[in-house]
């Protein structure tokens, strides 16, 4: 449900672009009434006749038969446009309609020989002072490519030129087609021009929209190497291609004119979660190239006559409010909830000094002046689709981060996803969730929650996966606390619903809302800073705002891309995943036995029961993932020099040990409650043996991930009291092999788990040549190198694996003589042979 974290689509100089002069000797094109050769220039009225269909807009679009023509005014030559290409309709397996494929700034310019060029403008480098000599050096090193060339077909009174764009939009041009990586991913070959066409063009005052159908040949993906590990990025062949040899997609290209006067930038701060844009700046006095990164946000400004009021602390209405229109295709009963989700953000903007800053409106009946494709209007689009999704993108000016417009995509079937989520996380407490179909009030509440989250993205806010960590777990059961603060300070977290609340707590509202952090983030992003001259001056003021909240966890931003900070997680609640997951599992144990009764219906089969059982298992797996992230965890707290303390700190050793103890207790001890025969016998031929093993194996493999083990080695090297890699090996081994000490019979589930554990240790003796590195997000710079992962052969990993296999071999040998259960004995004998062969290969 999200958009891009950081867009670096390129950068040119910050100064205003000028129309490129024609090369010396070139002759500017002129209107000519003489007859021309086919394909050459014609008199305007000979080309544009009374039979031509014409739409006026930023480009006047003409249609002659099957040909589409752009009439481009001289006044927009050299102006910058953003081309955004999105999927409109897709074949199965190729993503969702509305997903972005390409985004590029371009400008039209006249070239020699009666040509018009479409030049890509790359925002990579800039010079802050356009009066200094260094500007020319930047220009000389950043020549923008000519992406396309068009013959001028006619000139209108020396004020505009006409070009034929039919072949360009029908073809496979990178700016308005699939991204090359997507074509490789889906094994697509050449475009099939006889099956590709322009479906429609529409032009508006600041944008032109082109809908295209493109067909590609489908190719077989390259063969994978034998025994190669699964690669989710490996090329695949789409079902449509496998069945027919071809793949057809529908795409929409938007050409949106960027503001003539760029907005003022607000420099990015890693401690507040905004999307960002940036480029490298070369300054005359600077001794190195600087990366300038700025927040993505709307241009929200007070009217000049209201500035004095705002300085006095009075709320004022913005010069131009943010307005979202509700798609007329939206079912009537859901419109009020979508509108409420938009306007839930009004209180956040009030904290920034604005009233009525964000509004939701319906398109008046019969009003043809407001179109969903007109970039002057932002919409919540409603799609009658079985896709379970919603998304909140924006189109913004890469020069400044100013958001131009947004179209939130809302798929009808997201309601199915919401039903599943809320049932699994809330039905133990909320009786309204204990049925196949929710009533309108409950579904409306769910729609409002998701709408508010997506609107947050369109305002520039990223996911704050660290927000829910601000709430102590026991406060999630405190009705008075929840009524005041909610269960998370940010609706931008994936905290979903309060799954910790127990039936006896009397909690009635399990939903998140626009919270303390959200209001603060909007204040940081949108409150005007008066009486400063530059973004750098403004940054110093903003820094003081951040410092004033730096020690309050309610205001903390935890990035959504950090792979090792357990405070920043998706789908979790509370400040302790072990305790929160214990409560969550209690509720899953209440829900599972009741699913059959909640979903029974006359003449219906058990498909819905099967679906919801899998949802229960999926929620349980999430809890295991939340806890696992504590092991080898590293806290990352972005700071500036004014703040005390370290940026990077290992997760406390006690919490890591608690995490492994939790896994031993809730997962590695067979979760019998998941194996309810009254449910399983209705939906599966087996008894859940393989399903349990899969969850256990996935978690065990994650625990012994090379990057995680390397972090444990690193933290112990700095602090001997840290939770060590040897502690992990010991705690897992003693938990999984507890029967060696208790002398109890080992059941099927535990035998499988013990084999998985032994095989994992054996695999560690022969690591791959290059262990995968974990992702690393450095909040102060972009493009940082991955966190280091040592060559396992040159670290303690193999040594510890060998040592613990020796210990395990000794323990099994000691237990075998007193093992009376036949299958337990066979199992131990088998594992003993495997270990011996691994340790003493012949």
PLM regions and their residue ranges:
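Bacterial N-terminal signal peptides
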Residues: 1-7
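Solvent-exposed, polar/charged alpha-helical surfaces in well-ordered, non-transmembrane soluble domains
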Residues: 42, 336-343, 347, 449, ...
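Conserved catalytic/binding loops enriched for acidic/polar residues
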Residues: 468-842
């Amino acid at each position: 449900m999200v958009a891009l974290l950081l867009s670096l689509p390129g950068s040119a100089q910050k100064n205003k672009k000028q129309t490129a002069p024609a090369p010396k000797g070139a002759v500017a094109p002129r209107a000519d009434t003489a007859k021309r050769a086919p394909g050459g220039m014609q008199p305007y009225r000979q080309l544009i006749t009374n039979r031509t269909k014409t739409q006026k807009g930023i480009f006047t679009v003409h249609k002659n038969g099957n040909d589409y023509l752009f009439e481009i005014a001289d006044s927009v030559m050299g102006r910058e446009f953003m081309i955004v290409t999105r999927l409109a309709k897709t074949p199965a397996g190729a993503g969702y309609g509305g997903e972005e494929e390409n985004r590029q700034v371009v400008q039209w310019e006249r070239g020699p020989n009666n040509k018009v060029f479409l030049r890509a403008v790359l925002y990579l480098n800039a010079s802050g002072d356009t009066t200094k000599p260094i500007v020319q050096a930047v220009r000389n090193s950043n020549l923008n490519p000519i992406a396309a060339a068009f013959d001028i077909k006619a000139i209108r009174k020396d004020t505009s030129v006409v070009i034929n764009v039919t072949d360009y939009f029908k073809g496979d041009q990178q700016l308005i087609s699939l991204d090359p990586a997507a074509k490789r991913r889906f094994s697509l070959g050449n475009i099939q021009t006889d099956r590709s066409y322009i479906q429609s063009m529409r032009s508006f005052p600041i944008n032109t929209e082109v809908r295209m159908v493109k067909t590609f040949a489908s190719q077989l993906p390259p063969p994978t190497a034998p025994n190669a590990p699964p690669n989710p990025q490996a090329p695949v062949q789409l079902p449509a291609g496998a069945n027919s040899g071809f793949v057809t997609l529908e795409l929409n290209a938007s050409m949106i004119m960027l503001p003539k006067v760029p907005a003022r930038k607000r420099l990015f701060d890693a401690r507040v979660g905004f999307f960002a844009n940036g480029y490298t700046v070369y300054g005359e006095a600077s001794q190195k190239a600087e990366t300038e990164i700025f927040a993505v946000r709307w241009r929200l400004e007070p009217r000049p006559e209201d500035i004095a009021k705002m300085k006095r602390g009075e709320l004022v209405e913005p010069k131009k409010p943010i307005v979202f229109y509700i798609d007329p295709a939206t079912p009537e009963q859901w419109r009020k909830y979508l509108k409420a989700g938009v306007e839930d953000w009004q209180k956040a903007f009030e904290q920034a000094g604005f009233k009525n800053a964000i509004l939701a409106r319906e398109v008046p009946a019969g009003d043809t002046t407001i179109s969903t494709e007109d970039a002057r209007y932002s919409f919540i689009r409603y799609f009658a689709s079985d896709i379970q999704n919603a998304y909140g993108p924006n189109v913004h000016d890469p020069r400044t981060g100013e958001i131009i417009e947004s179209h939130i995509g809302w798929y009808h079937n997201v309601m199915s996803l919401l039903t599943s989520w809320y049932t699994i996380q809330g039905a133990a407490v909320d009786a309204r969730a204990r049925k196949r179909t929710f009533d309108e009030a409950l579904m409306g509440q769910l729609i409002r929650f998701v709408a508010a989250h997506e609107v947050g993205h369109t305002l520039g806010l990223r996911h704050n996966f660290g927000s829910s960590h601000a709430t102590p777990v026991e406060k999630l059961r405190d009705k008075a606390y929840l009524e005041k603060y909610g269960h998370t300070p940010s609706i931008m977290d994936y905290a979903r619903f309060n799954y910790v609340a127990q039936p006896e707590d009397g909690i009635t509202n399990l939903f998140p809302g626009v919270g303390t952090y959200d209001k603060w983030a909007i204040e940081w992003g949108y409150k005007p800073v008066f009486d400063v001259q530059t973004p750098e001056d403004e940054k110093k003021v903003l820094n003081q705002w951040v410092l004033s909240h730096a020690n309050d966890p309610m205001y903390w931003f935890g990035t959504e891309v950090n792979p090792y900070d357990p405070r920043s997680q998706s789908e979790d609640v509370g400040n302790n995943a072990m305790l929160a997951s214990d409560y969550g599992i209690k509720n899953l144990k209440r829900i599972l036995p009741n699913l059959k009764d909640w979903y029974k219906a006359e003449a219906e089969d058990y498909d819905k029961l099967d679906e919801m059982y899998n949802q229960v298992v999926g929620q349980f797996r999430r809890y295991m993932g939340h806890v696992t992230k504590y092991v080898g965890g590293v806290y990352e707290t972005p700071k500036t020099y004014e703040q005390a303390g370290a940026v990077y700190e290992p997760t406390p050793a006690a919490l890591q040990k608690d995490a492994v103890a939790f896994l031993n207790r809730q997962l590695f001890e067979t979760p019998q409650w998941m194996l309810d025969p009254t449910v399983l016998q209705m939906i599966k031929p087996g008894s859940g043996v393989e399903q349990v093993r899969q969850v256990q194996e996935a978690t065990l493999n994650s625990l012994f991930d090379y990057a995680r083990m390397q972090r444990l080695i690193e933290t112990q090297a700095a602090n001997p009291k840290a939770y060590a890699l040897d502690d992990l090996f010991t705690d897992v081994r003693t938990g999984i092999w507890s029967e060696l000490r208790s002398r109890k019979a080992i059941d099927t589930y535990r035998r499988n788990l013990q084999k998985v554990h032994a095989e994992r240790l054996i695999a560690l003796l022969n690591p791959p040549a290059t262990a995968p590195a974990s992702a690393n997000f450095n909040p102060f710079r972009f493009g940082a190198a991955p966190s280091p992962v040592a060559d396992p052969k040159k670290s303690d990993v193999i040594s510890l694996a060998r040592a613990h296999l020796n210990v395990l071999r000794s323990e099994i040998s000691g237990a075998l003589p007193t093992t009376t259960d036949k299958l337990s004995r066979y199992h131990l004998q088998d594992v003993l042979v495997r270990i011996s062969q691994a340790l003493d290969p012949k």
